[in-house]
Amino acid sequence: MTQVTVKELAQVVDTPVERLLLQMRDAGLPHTSAEQVVTDSEKQALLTHLKGSHGDRASEPRKITLQRKTTTTLKVGGSKTVSVEVRKKKTYVKRSPDEIEAERQRELEEQRAAEEAERLKAEEAAARQRAEEEARKAEEAARAKAAQEAAATAGAEPAVVADVAAAEPVAKPAAVEERKKEEPRRAPKRDEDDDRRDRKHTQHRPSVKEKEKVPAPRVAPRSTDEESDGYRRGGRGGKSKLKKRNQHGFQNPTGPIVREVNIGETITVAELAAQMSVKGAEVVKFMFKMGSPVTINQVLDQETAQLVAEELGHKVKLVSENALEEQLAESLKFEGEAVTRAPVVTVMGHVDHGKTSLLDYIRRAKVAAGEAGGITQHIGAYHVETERGMVTFLDTPGHAAFTAMRARGAQATDIVILVVAADDGVMPQTQEAVQHAKAAGVPIVVAVNKIDKPEANPDNIKNGLAALDVIPEEWGGDAPFVPVSAKLGTGVDELLEAVLLQAEVLELKATPSAPGRGVVVESRLDKGRGPVATVLVQDGTLRQGDMVLVGINYGRVRAMLDENGKPIKEAGPSIPVEILGLDGTPDAGDEMTVVADEKKAREVALFRQGKFREVKLARAHAGKLENIFENMGQEEKKTLNIVLKADVRGSLEALQGSLSGLGNDEVQVRVVGGGVGGITESDANLALASNAVLFGFNVRADAGARKIVEAEGLDMRYYNVIYDIIEDVKKALTGMLGSDLRENILGIAEVRDVFRSPKFGAIAGCMVTEGMVHRNRPIRVLRDDVVIFEGELESLRRFKDDVAEVRAGMECGIGVKSYNDVKVGDKIEVFEKVEVARSL
């Protein structure tokens, strides 16, 4: 950039040099001569100073006043109304930085003064406490000294008492003497009553020895001084010191008692009330007020119970009822030498962008041609030996219905290869794949596919992914972009090299000598072999014969197959295998662990099943209760019931999610039954009982099911592409919606004159201005564009001839059935009602 002197700058801004130097000095700049150089930052400082001096700084409004006026009408009886106008005015003041700083200083001063006052108060309290302690010590010392003096003079006291007694006149009332004679006889009885009363007010029963004790000897008469202390003797109203001492009075609590409530994953209303020390009816009443009608024995889920306890003012401690799970985690020991393992790579991207074709080239196998419709509908797991080492690949579907599968693939992986077609760009599933990878914290390697096409534009891909925070390495980011062609094999070696380089950076380790641990990628029900689960071993070694626990299922590994279907005896880290021998089909994403014995596996599996059932029931019940008031008074939705069977668990989940999302306020889809495997007799009976349609995705019905379908006339359909199921269900829902009546305006005629007819009454002489007027069609009579009559066109004539229709620009006579109040200037609108099919 060229340097500018003060003189040149003065010429540019058309001002004298002396004035410019004066302004620069006011702005705090060091320039004193016309030949000194002015930098860009100094120009900016000068411009800011000049703007401030010319009042631009104050051009911003410091105060905004909003005025709001609302007018309402108040009825005061009869037809009288009073207009009430409410005006509200609010002023918002923008404070300057100096005012903000002064406010902050004032708050600091107030805080400091409050702290000082608190400190002085604490010092005064401490001084008062010290003074009280010293006074107490002095009082104790004086009391001890007085006791010593009393002990020293104790010897002379009896003589003094005797002298005093001799000096007293012997003149006591007879009643006192009589009472003194009878008191020794009453004394033992009173003591027994006292003992009995004492025993009544204590929790302990007297021992046998205490019962057999000899009664105590009679005590000496009590002096009248004791009576003056507030004791009354004899009579029914007699009071004793023991009764006063042993009786406990109820004290009202000074504040609400806050209790700690332990809430597991499920809890009944009665258990929750007991922990809060309130009646169950109170909790039921409170939940009714919250809009949740419950019973005292109803099971609540953890979230609902937490909300209720917190609303009632108690502390909540969420506890996990996972003692068995914790014991299982402690028993799993991964000891041994950790070695480097192969990376698990997930291939993700939009549908038809070439993910499976790229894997085909790497594996030298034709998988894409075998997938129905050319799209991947399962998670494929393969491991490939390359020159630089082994790599395990997971291929995920790209269709929108397979969101859960893609998320599952990202969580079981180390590196994500994001395949983007160079001729298509960043698409919705591409964005979703980036979100899944970032949520799992997995590094991304971008493969820009189809670069052999002439319309390929790799720069467009970089710009699109940079907007999603995937920055190429050449732009200073951390995501390698590798141009490849799955068709020609261009750039595949560079892609594998980039993947293995990322794996080296991650330093992936595993312990092959430990028991196997992994994750379920996919599961299905095979007719000949039973439940089959595709498992990716993540750590340790899985061997044939191991007892495994997979989610809520367990079993002994009877056989293991690699991705080519060949039997193997063991599988190390990062190896995908199919295992046989489980008692059911686990959900994809469930964790697999090798346990010591079958007893432990069965115990944990049954515990998980029970917990899963409880949580599911609690949530289902809560959902029903929430909707009970919303649905009250509304028309019931039309429901399409479906029994759905698929070949693998992942496809079943994807289909259930997609079908449940269809529908609107009037129609809905309900999957009444679903599972993995072929269509059986029980599925057909379920469809018959629930009036449902049977859908089979890549599966077929057995002979018993086909017999029921034919006999009962059930609707059963087979599919192998997910698009076809969704389209058919949409069509069925559209048919259930029914149709709408739509009005089409056929023509408009303007009344020019009115005639009288003995047969039809008033006849309107009209000019057809728009469209065409038809006989025997419904009409509306409009006066000043307001509908005043709706009826039927009875007579339509032209030159005394009855006609069926009259076109625009022609005159005609119109007779309206049962209406004679036609006037000049009215418009007659002829229309028809058409039934139109509705859509979702």
From Swiss-Prot:
Region (G5): which ranges?
485-487
Q: Where is this region: G4?
A: 449-452
Which HAMAP family does the record cross-reference, listed alphabetically? Answer: IF_2_B
Species this protein is from: Pseudomonas aeruginosa (strain UCBPP-PA14)
Belongs to which family? Belongs to the TRAFAC class translation factor GTPase superfamily. Classic translation factor GTPase family. IF-2 subfamily.
- What is the residue range of the signal peptide feature? none
Q: Which GO terms describe its cellular component?
A: cytosol
Q: Which GO MF terms are attached to this record?
A: GTP binding; GTPase activity; translation initiation factor activity
Pfam families per the record?
EF-G_D2, GTP_EFTU, IF-2, IF2_assoc, IF2_N
Q: Give positions of region: G3.
A: 395-398
* Taxonomic lineage of the native organism: Bacteria, Pseudomonadati, Pseudomonadota, Gammaproteobacteria, Pseudomonadales
Chain residues that bind GTP: 349-356, 395-399, 449-452
Please report the name of this protein according to its UniProt entry. Translation initiation factor IF-2
